[in-house]
Amino acid sequence: MSVAVVPESNIMYSTVSVWMHKIWNSAFHVVGFESMEFNELVLLLLFITLNLIFLLLPFENGVSTASDLVNRAAHVALANSAFVFPLATRNSVFVTLIGVPFERIIKFHRWTGRMIFFMIALHGGTHIQQQYSATESISKALFGDNQYLTGSLAFLSIIIIVITSHAVIRRFAFEAFWWSHFTFIFFIIFGVLHNEWFAPYVAFGISLYVVDRLIRFVKSNIKSIKVVNIEPIQTGVTRVVFERDMHYEAGQYAFVNFPNLNAPLSLVTWHPVSLSSAPSIEDDGIPLHTVHLKAAGGFTKMLYEKARNQSGMSPGVLRMKFDGPYGKPSLEFSEQRTVMLVSGGIGVTPMISILRDLVDKQLSGLPLATQAIYFIWVIPDIDSYAWFASELQELLHRASALPDNKYIIDVKVFLTRSQTTPSSIFFQGRPSFDFLLKSVKDFHGSGDIAVGVCGPAVMIKEVKNSAMARSDRYGLVNVHSETYEL
């Protein structure tokens, strides 16, 4: 660590505000859901409560039968269906109205989707059971007449979507998640045929979704992209450098498509990826951008294998489409005096983009509050370091030109399954984020710390809770988190 004189902050928080910060931002694991902060848990409970209120409200005559209840469950599912489509739009109306980006709003899409599933399960399951009791025929219970046939097929569509939306499938078989989600078309068709109220409920939401798809189509086709370099890096990562005139911020992500990778399927297969370059990177005045894709599924694995074998993958041959950029870090890192960037595995991509951007601004003399940057990267072994070895070495070399008495650039790489000899950069084992945050707090004395973290859910939860534990009256630790999957 370089020695620098970083002035202490005179800020002082009240005990109440510190505890509110700790409680409101603490992370929990909720069975059936991804890890979430306490504030998200409150929103989830409010959402569930609101749905239960509409399900269980007293009926007009004060008397409700089982049939009344299950039919009301269908209407609650319809009400949620009105929101599930606009909540999945990337060019979201919610960004315009309340400033919440797609990656934050998508969790509400998942919640409404699951609520639709549970309400249809209550509605359809009860009717199927009643029909089976009356006929003792499974086929008649499921497909006995048009009402049962269309209802069963609509429910089957939802079952497929819910199963393939699991976080494990989104991460390791993104194409299965991507393609299975198009069964929502059958959900709409059979839903309309099943109930006359379905179309009025979902018409507006579907209209917003269609508009979003048109915007994405235009954005991804209107600007040409030139692939400058495609490079397979060991342990299954493909580095793609491309040229495109666009504005973006460090830490943003996009969706990429390589139409001629494996046509015809690749014509419509998109994959989410964080931009690993900084907005300022240029080569002779030409804006260059970089993405790193880890071979975790069919699409990314094929890209890596073809790049490694040089099978029709020269930069001039590979075509690329780009939908984005999207998202925005919840913290303005350039406005924070002390910044810690934590990443696990390929989750380093948005964090190294932020690191590059901060160092570029420090070197260029642009207005910047950041004086201390702590970069923590957790990877299995030294081979994974090759993903960004040249970038980190180049960054550290450039940062050496900064005055030691003003700036700190501290890089630590933790190897969890390697016997590499520890050095000033490499360390064996998993880090204690609580210890690292305590060390930074002790060194700087007072003032807020901005933490960015991207990696596995377990890591994000640990970092968040360590940040809350180290928040006190002399400085709060604020966290911006990103996950692997959308």
Residue map of PLM features:
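Ferredoxin-reductase
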Residues: 228-317, 379-380, 416
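Beta1/beta-strand and adjacent pyrophosphate-binding region of the FAD-binding site
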Residues: 337-344
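Histidine-anchored nucleotide/phosphate-binding helix
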Residues: 275, 348-366, 390
